Amino acid sequence: MVSMRIPAGVAAAAVAFLLFGAVPAAAACFESGVGCTNSGYMPYPALRRLSCDALWTVRNTIYSENGYCFKTARGLATFDNSSCSYDDLGMVPLNAYERENVGRIVKVERQKGCR
């Protein structure tokens, strides 16, 4: 068996590529039954099937879509800060679906022991 290490940025991009479905101007939609970030509640069973990396990508896509300015190396490698507006996560304006979806993702990340 051959083993390869894939850089985190490449892995995150691959996860995003595999998960993204059609992407409207203001929201990402994910395949695998997860749904769109801002127009419906993401089902727990679909979220539980995702890896920790995929959960991180989906959660942070919601923040990116709404103008969060990423500061970590992983965030900067994955998302474009060119049109960001908010340095504080608490100030990022989320609609009710987005707020609930972030909460659901965080809950599943905790259940799975994601970091």
Residue ranges and their predicted role:
Residues 47-85:
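Amphipathic alpha-helical packing elements
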Residues 27-48:
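Short N-terminal segments immediately surrounding and downstream of signal-peptide cleavage
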Residues 16-25:
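C-terminal segment of classical bacterial N-terminal signal peptides
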Residues 1-12, 17:
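Bacterial N-terminal signal peptides that target proteins for export
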Residues 70-115:
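Compact alpha-helical subdomains of small soluble proteins
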